[in-house]
Amino acid sequence: MSLKIRLARGGAKKRPYYRIVVADARSPRDGRFIEKIGTFNPLLAKDAAERVTLDTEKAKAWLEKGAQPTDRVARFLDAAGLLKREARNNPKKAEPGKKAQERAAERAAKAAEASEAASAE
């Protein structure tokens, strides 16, 4: 049985509220869970103390048992000092794709030809 520490959505439409739960990876997002270990209210200010509540003892116990946190929960655990999360770094994220680079090269070549033709006149 693969265990996940993840968010289960609650609250009304357009008013999300999440429970931080330990659940079997095969169970539905908002379905059956083993234990609730905290809450997350994204509507509160980022510096509000009640935004994320987490029972660190339970979280530590489940991590020792092999439960894998999702990305968002890993951020919460990192902020609580329970887990060291590697910062993601994707230097190629802002670069355009191959075809866009080819089109830009074509445009630059045409602009260079046009400037040469204009200077030749």
Swiss-Prot record:
Biological processes, Gene Ontology terms: translation
Pfam families associated with the record: Ribosomal_S16
InterPro entries named in the record: Ribosomal_bS16, Ribosomal_bS16_CS, Ribosomal_bS16_dom_sf
Gene Ontology CC terms, in alphabetical order: cytoplasm; small ribosomal subunit
Gene3D superfamilies per record: 3.30.1320.10
Record's keyword terms, sorted: Ribonucleoprotein, Ribosomal protein
Keyword Ribonucleoprotein: yes
One function term, GO molecular function aspect: structural constituent of ribosome
Biased composition (Low complexity): 111-121
Disulphide-bridged cysteine pairs: none
Region (Disordered): 85-121
Ranges of Basic and acidic residues composition bias in the record: 85-110
Family to which this protein belongs: Belongs to the bacterial ribosomal protein bS16 family.
PANTHER family linked to this entry: 30S RIBOSOMAL PROTEIN S16, SMALL RIBOSOMAL SUBUNIT PROTEIN BS16M
Protein name (Swiss-Prot/TrEMBL): Small ribosomal subunit protein bS16
Species in which this protein is naturally found: Azorhizobium caulinodans (strain ATCC 43989 / DSM 5975 / JCM 20966 / LMG 6465 / NBRC 14845 / NCIMB 13405 / ORS 571)
Taxonomic lineage: Bacteria, Pseudomonadati, Pseudomonadota, Alphaproteobacteria, Hyphomicrobiales
